Regions:
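Rossmann-fold NAD(P)-binding glycine/threonine-rich loop
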Residues: 95-98, 102, 115, 123-145, ...
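Structural motif
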Residues: 11, 114-116
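A structured beta-alpha segment of the ubiquitous adenosine-cofactor-binding alpha/beta core
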Residues: 69-114, 138
Length: 163
């Protein structure tokens, strides 16, 4: 039997939170981490996307995705209730960082915890998102960025993203 060690409280911001990668892969994986007791306390999962979606509507979308993409019999109402309480939604267009008010408000007061920005977006948005995080004061000593592969179309575009 595997042993799972709970992690410290964190905020995970998934840019591209309404996309296929988030709904099909990331959120089911996070559901497993919640179910195994690895994500505890006040840890939050914040989906960020340019779409104007109410939180309840986003939660319904996530529940539907979990029921669809988890293996048969793995979805449990109790684990979903725990995960649902951790999920937030912020409308946030990567191209207009001066309009990230919803995300800034959600992250205000949590500067001491680990803050992970998961960029489940097109590589062309990696730079604007990183710049938007900095411009909005969302980068702390505990901040991390996770980039979804591939990085660019070729060597030159990968170097451009990396710089």
């Amino acid at each position: 039997m595997a042993t799972f060690i709970p992690v410290d409280e964190f905020d995970l911001v998934i840019f591209g939170g309404t996309g296929d990668l988030a709904l099909r892969k990331l959120l089911p994986a996070l559901y497993h981490r919640v179910s195994d007791g690895q994500i505890t306390g006040g840890s939050r999962i914040i989906a960020a996307s340019r779409r104007d979606v109410a939180r309840d509507d986003y939660l319904a979308t996530v529940e539907d995705a979990l029921r669809r993409y988890l293996p048969d019999g793995e979805f449990r109402d109790e684990q979903w209730a725990d995960m649902r309480d951790r999920i937030y939604y912020a409308q946030c267009d990567a191209q207009t960082p001066d309009q990230w008010h919803a995300l800034v408000d959600l992250l205000q007061g949590t500067e001491d915890r680990v803050r992970v920005a998961y960029l489940a977006t097109a590589p062309a948005l990696f730079g604007p998102i990183a710049q938007g995080l900095a411009a909005n004061g969302l980068v702390t000593g505990n901040s991390r960025i996770v980039l979804e592969k591939p990085l660019g179309r070729d060597y030159e575009s990968a170097c451009e993203i990396n710089n």
